[in-house]
Amino acid sequence: MSTAANEPSRSRGKAPAGERVADWADGRLGIYSLAKANMRKIFPDHWSFMLGEVCLYSFIIIILTGVYLTLFFHPSMAEVEYHGSYVPLQGQMMSEAYASTLDISFDVRGGLLIRQIHHWAALIFLAGMFVHMMRVFFTGAFRKPREVNWLFGFLLLVLGMFTGFTGYSLPDDLLSGTGIRFMEGAILSVPIVGTYISFFLFGGEFPGHDFVSRFYSIHILLLPGIMLGLLVGHLILVFYHKHTQFAGPGKTNKNVVGMPLLPVYTAKAGGFFFLVFGVISVVSAIATINPIWPSGPTGPTRSPPAPSRLVLGFSEGLIRVMPGWEINAWGHTLVLGVFVPLLIFPLVLAAIAVYPFIESWVTGYKREHYILDRPLLDRPRNAPTRTAFGVAWLTVYFVLLIGGGNDLWATHFHLSINAITWFVRIAFFVGPVVAFIATKRICLGLQRRDKDKVLHGRESAIIKRLPHGEFIEVHEPISQEQLHTLTAHEQYKPAEIGPTVDENGVERKVSGTQKLRAKLSESYYGEESQIPKPTVEEYKEITSGHGHH
């Protein structure tokens, strides 16, 4: 028996080295069972899902280039005399951090290219996360059970902002010094504890002698470590919850239609990584970003025209357009012109973080009837109120971004900086309201157009003249795929307060919270917030040849 059992293994010969290594690992880690459960994981195919991949690959590029830069950067504020290759600054006294950054740019082989790849990848990472979160927001991909993953993504965006700021501050050039001074002023505006926080951060009076080394530790160890953990958790939850998908034939709330992880998706993802790396490298090779040599080292008597940063620019815009109000009481000054924007900044971020929970409470989506493990994504037009809120927020963001760069707008377009400031102040309050109303009306108009397309077909551009002289355009029925896309979305009813009296005829107490929830729910799912989908009877009428041309 033993001889017969051993015959197949003898005829097969010695297993390949890779298989032997895999067998060794499986015997200790059980990788075969893990691979069996995940290698055939299905991923939907849609261009918007690539936004998350851009963020992931940019983060990997940031880590790779950052490791290279740490080999040559000296995080010290000790003053040295510069004797490097950049002639205009030779002989000048500067911090060792600034001198080492100049050496990376001009003396280290490939150093300038790596610096620029690192910087461009950071910007693309932040911009990619911003756009990715907007995609998740507008399509409703944050709904139960994915609220935790929304929080992970939100924390990645916030930590990415602060990681970018600390990295931007490390070279100790004039631009980074201006940003540090801006941050220090914001910290000092905090009543009671602002001074203590500033002394703790800078190790004494600004600028101190330790902030570069402290920011360096935060930039390369603390924040990236937390972000890496959040990123891993984010990906694990994507696998656990399965991927969301847009409506289409064969797609329901109980399945995922797409490509398997191996070999199709992995091959595409690998190619896309090198494509992202290549594009960033080409951009870095031909487009200079953050040149530190023209402005020189930081100094207390110089202030450059600093452009507003991509994500933190809106916080800078808040401070620039806020009136310089102050309150003097009991020998202390409360600088409202800085402190109020400093309060608004975290409040806006907190509102973004908790929005999924607010919507689930308002709309009742968390009720058992609406719990879906793998919900189909919304088309933004089918969620007019949410889409209007998103566009209103984007309006605020871009208005404040203009405020953050008001000096550059004024100099480049020959405008009055006071006029720009007043425009931003007014648009901050008026713009979101106008954007909300306009967006909601546009969404409802698109819903009406979709309903008309389902009932009457699409326009064919064929004009016919009837016997009595009337001209009409012939409409053709839409495809089954289009029909499914236009009618697959669910339409919910707004939450109701219920009867005003109980079963005994006694008036039931209704709390103010219940009334508020019902009113807000009406704004999401009421008659004025969604156009009813065509009924089966209406569709049968069109398919039977009646009611359309």
From Swiss-Prot:
Chain sites annotated for binding heme 2: H132, H234
TM region(s), chain numbering: 54-74, 122-142, 150-170, 182-202, 220-240, 269-289, 334-354, 389-409, 417-437
Source species: Streptomyces lividans
Cellular component per GO, a single term: plasma membrane
GO molecular function, one term: metal ion binding
Organism domain of life: Bacteria
Free-text cofactor note: Binds 2 heme groups non-covalently per subunit.
Pfam families referenced in this protein's UniProt entry, alphabetically: Cytochrom_B_N_2
Binding site residues for heme 1: H118, H219
Gene name as annotated: qcrB
Keywords associated with the record: Cell membrane, Electron transport, Heme, Iron, Membrane, Metal-binding, Respiratory chain, Translocase, Transmembrane, Transmembrane helix, Transport
Protein name (database record): Cytochrome bc1 complex cytochrome b subunit
Reactions catalysed according to its record: a quinol + 2 Fe(III)-[cytochrome c](out) = a quinone + 2 Fe(II)-[cytochrome c](out) + 2 H(+)(out)
BP terms from Gene Ontology: respiratory electron transport chain
Protein role: Cytochrome b subunit of the cytochrome bc1 complex, an essential component of the respiratory electron transport chain required for ATP synthesis. The bc1 complex catalyzes the oxidation of ubiquinol and the reduction of cytochrome c in the respiratory chain. The bc1 complex operates through a Q-cycle mechanism that couples electron transfer to generation of the proton gradient that drives ATP synthesis. The cytochrome b subunit contains two ubiquinol reactive sites: the oxidation (QP) site and the reduction (QN) site.
SUPFAM superfamilies for this protein: Transmembrane di-heme cytochromes
InterPro entries found in the cross-reference section: Cyt_b/b6_N, Cytb/b6-like_sf, Di-haem_cyt_TM
Subunit structure: The cytochrome bc1 complex is composed of a cytochrome b (QcrB), the Rieske iron-sulfur protein (QcrA) and a diheme cytochrome c (QcrC) subunit.
Membrane-topology descriptor: Multi-pass membrane protein
Gene3D superfamilies: Cytochrome Bc1 Complex, Chain C
Entry EC number(s): 7.1.1.8
Top-level EC class as recorded in UniProt: translocase
Cofactors, names only: heme
Keyword Electron transport: yes
